[in-house]
């Protein structure tokens, strides 16, 4: 074991015999410091749970003269054990001695009280831990430290630290000389979980409740207690209502009900003013009477007024409809009058034109009778010719004949049977179907046949009842346009067919023929030559 012993310290020099007497007091003080340091090391080792066999090696007063090196040595062992690295100094004898009789010095009353409170807290904490270990684990009653608890613990620890610092400063002020020799107390870590008094059981939050039969029972009991508390509070509030306040509320309620059943004067004006102004009071009473009668059943004049009002309300939409109908009729009359005026103007213009054209028509008829023998002679000489050069030469005598020549100059295709001329050969071939008695268009309803498709279509209107041609004046409808033209002559008064023997004129040609037969005894013209029936092929056109 000799190789394990450290070298001697340079500070531990043997004193001379001459200086033993002088430095006796100093040596005694030094040995006391070493003994106190040894006690401190032993206490710290016991607190850190070091092995007992290492204690002789950890500290030997003969090897190290200064106790200031021991905190550095113990610091490494503390880190190995997992404790925080906090600077530590050897404890003074005052920190080791717990009893007042064992101390060599006296403390202030505040310091004494503080030490006593700390001892009591430690004892109560140990007892509480022992009881907690003995109790069975119940997950439903496990407490959870909240922010309020930590804040409260921090406040208690800060107050303890401040009291300690204040007491230490007072001790230094009272004993300035002893504070120089005695080492300061070590720095201890603050325990945030410690408190001066045992914490009361707090209500847990909803997040840390674990289901168990005990927790369910506790929950139901807590709900029952809360319901009982709320009922007690409600009963207390009802009993605590001031009777004066209750009476005031009752009076206000009755006043509001009576205001609906009493005259206005009871609330609007004082009684003195109502007595002075009797007329106003009478008017108010009448108003109240009418109001009560109205609320009772709308009797008397009010019922009549109400019925009149409802009748007017119901008649308003009918009046509006009548006004709209009258306006529409006026607009239609105006439109029909304007259309009638236009038709009358057109009829007058046509009548004047016909009066001017009648002598020209008579001249044209005379010329036509004169041209018939010439045309017959020309047809005998040229049976296949359809040209009308002879007719054009004979009609160039007058201005009207010149205009007619211009109109007929484009008509180069003439019928051999009746002398009609056409612009196109297709039109002539369709016209020849009349003379040949060929009817290729039958009616799908009755089987009647027609020469032209337009005639067949007009005939089908009789079966279908369709009348597409409508009069703009009287809105009468017709199946054929010719009938509409004849009908319009009634509204305009236009009579295009006039008798050359008298001054009478007619709207239809049939009426003119009947007039001649009855009045002037004219026989209908008898044709000497009967129309020939011939078949015309499409190649002849």
Swiss-Prot record:
Any GO CC annotation of this UniProt entry: chromatin
A Pfam family recorded for this sequence: zf-C2H2
Major site of localization recorded for this protein: nucleus
UniProt-annotated location(s): Nucleus
Compositionally biased tracts (Low complexity): 157-169, 194-206, 355-383
Superkingdom per UniProt: Eukaryota
Spans annotated as Disordered: 1-21, 110-216, 313-334, 354-412, 514-541
Tissue note: Almost exclusively restricted to precursors and early differentiating cells of the embryonic PNS. Expressed in the R8 photoreceptor during third instar eye development beginning within the morphogenetic furrow of the eye imaginal disk.
GO biological process: axon guidance; chaeta morphogenesis; compound eye photoreceptor development; negative regulation of apoptotic process; negative regulation of transcription by RNA polymerase II; Notch signaling pathway; peripheral nervous system development; photoreceptor cell differentiation
Keyword field contains Zinc-finger: yes
Keyword Cell inner membrane (UniProt): no
Pro residues composition-biased segments: 1-10
Gene Ontology molecular functions: bHLH transcription factor binding; DNA-binding transcription factor activity; DNA-binding transcription factor activity, RNA polymerase II-specific; RNA polymerase II cis-regulatory region sequence-specific DNA binding; sequence-specific DNA binding; zinc ion binding
UniProt keyword annotations, A-Z: Developmental protein, DNA-binding, Metal-binding, Notch signaling pathway, Nucleus, Repeat, Sensory transduction, Transcription, Transcription regulation, Vision, Zinc, Zinc-finger
Function: Transcription factor both necessary and sufficient for proper development of most cell types of the embryonic and adult peripheral nervous system (PNS). Essential component of the proneural Notch signaling pathway required for proper sensory organ precursor (SOP) differentiation. Correct expression requires expression of scalloped (sd). Repression of rough (ro) in R8 photoreceptor is an essential mechanism of R8 cell fate determination.
PANTHER family: MYONEURIN, ZINC FINGER PROTEIN
Protein name: Zinc finger protein sens
